[in-house]
Amino acid sequence: MSRKRTSPNRNVQIADQIQRDLSELIMREVKDPRIGIVTIQSVELTPDYAHAKVYFTALTGDPDKTQEALNHASGHLHNLLFKRLHIHTVPTLHFHYDQTIEKAVEMSRLIKEANSTRAKDDDEAGAPAKDD
């Protein structure tokens, strides 16, 4: 007997739907004061849909406290998703703070700093020597 495999496209569709639903549910249904303005960046599902890594950014509040609060509310969010999604297995939610934006800003800063240092070194190397 062959096992039915899920298509990668279906996995992406379900992850996208979970992302949209979680964004709405967190905004409307979760009343934890530790959770400020949150954006769900992406959702990664395991092939069997048993677990979902949910990556978020927080515009306000402490990211660690927000992550703790979201993981605390994950059971409630799981139940709300179960009522919305029409799939056999609704994944267990695991929230992770997405540091992509901070890392990109830091990389840009480092590149800018390296370029300005290089330009300064080039200017000093190309400048004519002063006569006293």
Swiss-Prot record:
Q: Where in the cell is it found?
A: Cytoplasm
A biological process term (GO) from this entry: maturation of SSU-rRNA
Q: Which domain of life is it from?
A: Bacteria
List, alphabetically, the SUPFAM superfamilies matched. Answer: Ribosome-binding factor A, RbfA
Q: Does the keyword Secreted apply?
A: no
Q: What is its main location?
A: cytoplasm
Name the GO cellular-component terms.
Answer: cytosol
InterPro entries recorded for this chain?
KH_dom-like_a/b, RbfA, RbfA_dom_sf
The residue ranges crossing the membrane are none
What keywords are assigned to this protein?
Cytoplasm, Ribosome biogenesis
Q: Which Pfam families match?
A: RBFA
Q: Which GO terms describe its molecular function?
A: ribosomal small subunit binding
Family, per entry? Belongs to the RbfA family.
Q: Which NCBIfam families match?
A: rbfA
Outline what the protein does.
Answer: One of several proteins that assist in the late maturation steps of the functional core of the 30S ribosomal subunit. Associates with free 30S ribosomal subunits (but not with 30S subunits that are part of 70S ribosomes or polysomes). Required for efficient processing of 16S rRNA. May interact with the 5'-terminal helix region of 16S rRNA.
Give the quaternary structure.
Monomer. Binds 30S ribosomal subunits, but not 50S ribosomal subunits or 70S ribosomes.
**Could you tell me what this protein is called?**
Ribosome-binding factor A
This chain's source organism reads Burkholderia cenocepacia (strain ATCC BAA-245 / DSM 16553 / LMG 16656 / NCTC 13227 / J2315 / CF5610) (Burkholderia cepacia (strain J2315))
Q: What is the lineage of its organism?
A: Bacteria, Pseudomonadati, Pseudomonadota, Betaproteobacteria, Burkholderiales
